[in-house]
């Protein structure tokens, strides 16, 4: 095989794998998180953008209110872009979703569910976050 053909095949392979890799890096448009009664905290995977909508429900069977915390990345650090406390048996649907602060740049966001009180468990809650 000629050197020219070999270089051509290798470059084609690199391009193919590069394009494939790029498809797996893409962030989801919406994410969900489920806080179970045995967990003191739980977080969703990341969603990319400048701001988000988030909502959720805290089950009637929960023993505590749950903090719904929208977090975003700035450089190496995570910051809070919105936070609401939802009592047991209450929640918000997607039509009445909370909105995070708006940033002037795109970054990763995630939704964190954290029962009220230090290291508290005993809550069953669902949370959702989506691109605006």
Kindly give the residue locations of the regions a language model identified:
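Sec-dependent N-terminal signal peptides of Gram-positive bacterial secreted proteins and lipoproteins
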Residues: 1-26
């Amino acid at each position: 095989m000629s050197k020219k053909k070999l270089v051509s095949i290798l470059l084609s392979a690199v391009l193919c794998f590069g394009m494939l890799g790029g498809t797996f890096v893409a962030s989801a448009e919406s994410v969900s998180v489920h806080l179970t009664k045995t967990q003191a905290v739980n977080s969703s995977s990341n969603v990319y953008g400048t701001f988000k909508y988030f909502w959720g429900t805290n089950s009637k069977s929960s023993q505590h209110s749950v903090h719904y915390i929208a977090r975003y990345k700035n450089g190496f650090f995570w910051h809070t872009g919105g936070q609401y406390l939802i009592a047991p048996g209450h929640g918000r649907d997607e039509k009445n979703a909370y909105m995070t602060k708006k940033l002037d740049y795109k970054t990763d966001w995630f939704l964190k569910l954290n029962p009220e009180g230090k290291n508290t468990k005993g809550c069953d809650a669902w949370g959702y976050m989506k691109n605006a």
